[in-house]
Amino acid sequence: MKRTYQPSKLVRARRHGFRARMATVGGRKVIANRRRQGRKKLSA
């Protein structure tokens, strides 16, 4: 059986990147919450 995690920088950026987060209301909330928490990295 193949492992489930097959890393790809492109897929990671498209699914969890900053622009992907900003595209939806929920994603914007995620960014806002992480900003409020003071995270150094806001998204993948």
Swiss-Prot record:
One BP annotation, GO: translation
GO molecular function: structural constituent of ribosome
Keywords per UniProt: Ribonucleoprotein, Ribosomal protein
Pfam families: Ribosomal_L34
InterPro entries attached to this UniProt entry: Ribosomal_bL34, Ribosomal_bL34_CS
PROSITE patterns per UniProt: RIBOSOMAL_L34
GO cellular component entries: ribonucleoprotein complex; ribosome
NCBIfam families for this protein: rpmH_bact (TIGR01030)
Alphabetized PANTHER family for the sequence: LARGE RIBOSOMAL SUBUNIT PROTEIN BL34M, MITOCHONDRIAL RIBOSOMAL PROTEIN 34 FAMILY MEMBER
HAMAP family: Ribosomal_bL34
Protein name: Large ribosomal subunit protein bL34
Organism: Paramagnetospirillum magneticum (strain ATCC 700264 / AMB-1)
